[in-house]
């Protein structure tokens, strides 16, 4: 009897990790953006700053549930510290932030909204946000940044 081979189910977002210039990029689109910024001589740091969207807190109530992955025993998982939620944009420059996003994962839309709220409430209107989703939009982002720098 032949044993069936099963393919492991992958999540909806499959980006390939790529190393370029000694930097490990999470996707080919991030590398493309890096190369475009470098070619245009626009200074930006890759994953240069992490922002805390929601601080950690103590959860002192009971919470009857399984583990967050849906496995494990259905029991009290409350009365513990809840970790903070952080966000690290792909590129950060003097007056811009770029988040390259081919296909958003499940948590990204919420993080992006929380990030926009944080920028609105805690920072001067210093940055312009760009979220290119393909190489054409990366090229357009470069043009827009250069136009802003020349005005």
Name what the model sees in each region.
Residues 1-151:
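Electrostatic, structured charged patches in enzyme active sites and in nucleic-acid/phosphate-binding
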């Amino acid at each position: 009897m032949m044993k069936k081979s099963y393919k492991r189910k992958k999540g909806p977002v499959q980006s390939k990790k790529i190393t370029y210039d000694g930097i490990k990029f999470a996707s080919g689109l991030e590398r493309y953006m890096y190369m475009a910024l470098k070619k245009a001589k626009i200074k930006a740091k890759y994953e240069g700053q992490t922002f805390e969207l929601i601080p950690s807190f103590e959860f002192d109530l009971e919470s009857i549930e399984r583990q967050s992955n849906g496995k494990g025993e259905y029991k009290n998982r409350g009365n513990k510290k809840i970790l903070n939620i952080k966000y690290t944009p792909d590129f950060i420059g003097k007056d811009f932030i770029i988040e390259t996003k081919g296909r958003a994962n499940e948590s990204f839309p919420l993080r992006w909204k929380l990030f926009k709220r944080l920028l609105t409430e805690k920072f001067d209107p210093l940055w312009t946000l760009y979220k290119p989703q393909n190489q054409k939009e990366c090229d357009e982002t470069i043009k827009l940044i250069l136009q802003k720098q020349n005005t």
